[in-house]
């Protein structure tokens, strides 16, 4: 089954058709990444598009790697495997960055009970800087993308479809969601 809260869209577009044709000719060349979930079922961490293409191509089996991964390790692996894809939608980057940043903060450890708020902010800032370096974006741009997750779905779709400018959308994200409904 698919990874919970998977932020990347599997679209039946021209690129998918190209992938299906490639799979028909060559098979699936790169294994998908799976893990066992709490119900002892296989959960797809990475490879949702390859799996979909294989199904459309009529394949019944594909190569897979099964790893023992915590939730945070699975999130990091899923985002890392997908974030380098060309033409990611702003919404995909937004939720992927948000998920990975949260996982990185948890992996960095929670502050001790006697530490101040500044320590927690430092963990967040350092994690955002590390993420920015990993994906080739500025720390500020990571922050802007994550703000998009505060938009109502209708406005986020407008950003994805290039009908709402990115910077305007970031500004709108600070407005209460009930007010966003009126926009």
Predicted features, each with a name:
Residues 52, 153, 181:
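Alpha-helical elements of the RecA-like P-loop NTPase motor core of helicases
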Residues 17-20, 98, 181:
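Amphipathic, non-transmembrane alpha-helical secondary structure
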Residues 1-67, 73-87:
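Short, charged/polar connector segments at secondary-structure boundaries
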Residues 174-183:
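A short, Lys/Arg-enriched interface patch at domain edges and termini
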Residues 75, 79, 119-122, 155, ...:
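Generic structural signal of hydrophobic/aromatic residues within well-ordered alpha-helices
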Residues 11-14, 18, 48-49, 70, ...:
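Charged, alpha-helix-enriched surfaces in structured cytosolic catalytic cores
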Residues 31, 62-63, 140, 167, ...:
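A local structural micro-motif
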Residues 85-175:
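Alpha-helical interaction elements
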């Amino acid at each position: 089954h698919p990874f919970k809260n998977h932020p990347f869209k599997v679209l039946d577009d021209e690129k998918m058709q190209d992938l299906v044709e490639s799979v028909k000719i060559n098979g699936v060349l790169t294994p998908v990444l799976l893990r066992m979930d709490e119900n002892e079922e296989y959960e797809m961490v990475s490879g949702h598009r390859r799996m979909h293409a294989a199904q459309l191509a009529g394949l019944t089996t594909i190569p897979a790697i099964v790893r023992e991964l915590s939730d945070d390790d699975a999130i990091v692996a899923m985002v890392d495997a997908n974030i380098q894809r060309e033409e990611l939608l702003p919404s995909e980057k937004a939720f992927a960055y948000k998920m990975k940043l949260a996982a990185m903060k948890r992996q960095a450890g929670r502050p001790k009970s006697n530490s101040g708020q500044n320590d927690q902010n430092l963990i967040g800032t350092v994690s955002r800087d590390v993420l920015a370096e990993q994906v080739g974006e500025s720390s500020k741009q990571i922050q802007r993308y994550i703000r998009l997750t505060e938009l109502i779905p209708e406005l986020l779709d407008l950003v994805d479809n290039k009908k709402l400018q990115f910077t305007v959308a970031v500004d709108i994200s600070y407005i209460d969601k009930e007010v966003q409904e009126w926009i």
